[in-house]
Every structure is written in C-alpha cells, then in structure tokens.
C-alpha cells in the first residue's frame, strides 16, 4: 500500500512554504489539490506557487487545464492517481497539498465518480430552470429530497446541485444513500493527513493582506489579459474568487474598491467553509501554527508524527 502525505488547510494559512520544506526533507514531489491552480494563465488570483518558490521541488497538476474547459472532481482524481503512481515509481514521496476539500476527499475517501447515472435531457431542463428562476430555486428544490446535499452545497454550486437532483431522479436515492453501503475509508493508500490552522482573526488578516498583494502584483491586468484572450464570466474558471469580482469591475458594475472588498469577504467566507469541511474527517491531525515558533518547528512536528506511525 502506497504512503501519501496530505497537507491541507484554509486559504492563506501557509501551506506552500511548509509543504516545500517537507518535500525537500522527504525526497518528495507535490501534487496540487487546488481547483484554481489547475488552470493555465491564472497565476496571481490563484496565488499560484512560482518557480522560485518551488525551490526545485517538482509540482504536479498546476497549469494543466485551459480556462475554457470544465474540470471535474473525477478528472482530478484520475490525474492525481496517475501522478501518485508516477512519483512512487521513481522512489519519491507523494505529497498532496491544497485547500479544495472535495479534491482531497476524492483521493482519501471511497467515492464513486464513475458518472454511471446520467440523464442529459433532465440535466438540460434543470439548467433552463436555473436560468429562468435562479440558482436559489434549484437549491431549495434539493432541500425537499436530499437534505444532506442541500446543507453541503451552496446555490452557486449549480453543477453539483443539478448532479444531486439528477442522481435522485434516476435512482430514487440521494447521493448519501448510494454511498452509505460503501466503506468510505477503503482506499489503496496509507495516508498521513495534517491540517494547518491558526487563530481566526490572524488568518483573516493574512487573507486581507494577500488580496492587497495580489492587486499590487497585477491582478487587474491578469484579468484583462484573460478577458482579451476570450475567457468570460460564463466559464467555470472565471467564476473563481478574485476573477469574477474584477470582471464585474471591468464591466462597470462595481468600483475597484468594491471589488477588492468583495474579494476579501469572499475569501474569508471560503476559509470558514474550508475549515468546516476539514473538521469532518477524524483521521486528520490538526496543527495549530500559533503554538510553534516557526515553520521549521512545524515541519519537524509533521515528520516526527509520520515516523511514529
């Protein structure tokens, strides 16, 4: 059974620096589990790790999808599994790093992403309803038949809301019911799972500062370039935090100051949702960064914990 290390946590908590230091000590390579860093050309708004920051550590699943393409959890799982096989075949250690909980869970939980249940016509009808009556209407519709999915998903998660409705229409069962007979932790990996966290107010301050740095580093110009390349707000990639707000500014819907505040607010709310998601997995070891002097102490703690297992 292959060993994999997972370093997760909310946005701006400092996963990148710590994971690279760990990779250097473990002869490891990093697999990004980030739903925005997967896209090409979207560097500043996704806080994508730079070549200099990588410090010679090979990174996988960064800059592999064109922003015009839809990218699913199933696609991530397949690509990440291939990367794990590649890394281990070269006697190196796979390190999964990111904050997209569903991406991480696709690897460390026994989820079915085969897409066996499909009804294209019904799916298209739901998309038409969403366009006519709004995303919130479909989200409320989900409440009556799949309360678990309703609580997990937000109205803006339209693709997954429609998927939950589609599965119920075909099978008469919710996604949770279909997975209830499956051993959730029956996976082909031996996992070492660590979640970085810190005082909430400190985290929010780091998030606000990161957004300010993104603006100084040219976020507006990056979005202008993407728009000029033909990418628009209807695309999955351009609905990411930081991109949709700047697009609204460029379209004259809001001021730049309003866009910046929306990015900060959206990022803080996203961090809160990430923490809620990660708390669901009892296998994870939480690392409170506030009690350590520096990142090197955290790296030592994680490496020591792995050796003890």
From Swiss-Prot:
GO biological process: tRNA modification
Residues engaged in binding substrate: 11-16
The protein's required cofactors: Mg(2+)
Signal peptide, first to last residue: none
Site (Interaction with substrate tRNA): residue numbering on this chain: 100, 123
Entry annotated with the keyword Mitochondrion: no
Gene3D superfamilies recorded: 1.10.20.140, P-loop containing nucleotide triphosphate hydrolases
Binding site for ATP: 9-16
Interaction with substrate tRNA as annotated region, ranges: 34-37
Catalyzed reactions: adenosine(37) in tRNA + dimethylallyl diphosphate = N(6)-dimethylallyladenosine(37) in tRNA + diphosphate
Entry-linked InterPro entries: Dimethylallyltransferase, IPT, P-loop_NTPase
Classification via SUPFAM superfamilies: P-loop containing nucleoside triphosphate hydrolases
EC code: 2.5.1.75
Entry-linked Pfam families: IPPT
Entry's Gene Ontology molecular function annotations: ATP binding; tRNA dimethylallyltransferase activity
Source species, domain of life: Bacteria
Function text: Catalyzes the transfer of a dimethylallyl group onto the adenine at position 37 in tRNAs that read codons beginning with uridine, leading to the formation of N6-(dimethylallyl)adenosine (i(6)A).
Subunit (UniProt): Monomer.
Family: Belongs to the IPP transferase family.
Protein name per UniProt: tRNA dimethylallyltransferase
Species of provenance: Clostridium acetobutylicum (strain ATCC 824 / DSM 792 / JCM 1419 / IAM 19013 / LMG 5710 / NBRC 13948 / NRRL B-527 / VKM B-1787 / 2291 / W)
Name of the encoding gene: miaA
């Amino acid at each position: 059974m292959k060993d994999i290390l997972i370093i997760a946590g909310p946005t701006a908590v400092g996963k990148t620096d710590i994971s690279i230091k760990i990779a250097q000590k473990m002869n490891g390579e990093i697999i990004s589990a980030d739903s925005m860093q997967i896209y090409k050309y979207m560097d500043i708004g996704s806080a994508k790790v730079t070549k200099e920051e990588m410090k010679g550590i090979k990174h996988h699943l960064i800059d592999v999808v064109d922003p015009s393409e839809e990218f699913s959890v199933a696609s991530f799982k397949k690509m990440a599994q291939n990367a794990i096989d590649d890394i281990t075949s070269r006697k190196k250690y796979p390190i999964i790093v990111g904050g997209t909980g569903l991406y991480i869970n696709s690897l460390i939980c026994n989820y079915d992403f085969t897409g066996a249940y499909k009804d294209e016509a019904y799916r298209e009808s739901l998309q038409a309803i969403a366009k006519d009556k709004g995303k919130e209407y479909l989200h409320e519709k989900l409440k009556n038949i799949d309360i678990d999915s309703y609580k997990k998903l937000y109205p803006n998660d339209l693709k997954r809301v429609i998927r939950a409705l589609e599965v119920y229409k075909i099978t008469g069962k919710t996604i949770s019911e279909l997975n209830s007979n499956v051993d959730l932790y029956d996976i082909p990996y031996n996992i070492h799972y660590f979640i970085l966290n810190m005082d909430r107010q400190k985290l929010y301050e780091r998030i606000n500062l990161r957004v300010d740095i993104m603006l100084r580093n040219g976020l507006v110009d990056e979005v202008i370039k993407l728009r000029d390349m033909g990418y628009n707000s209807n695309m999955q990639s351009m609905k990411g935090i930081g991109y949709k707000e700047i697009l609204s500014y460029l379209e004259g819907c809001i001021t730049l100051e309003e866009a910046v505040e929306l990015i900060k607010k959206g990022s803080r709310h996203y961090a809160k949702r990430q923490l809620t998601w990660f708390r669901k997995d009892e296998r994870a070891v939480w690392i409170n960064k506030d009690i350590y002097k520096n990142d090197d102490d955290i790296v030592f703690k994680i490496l020591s914990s792995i050796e003890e297992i």
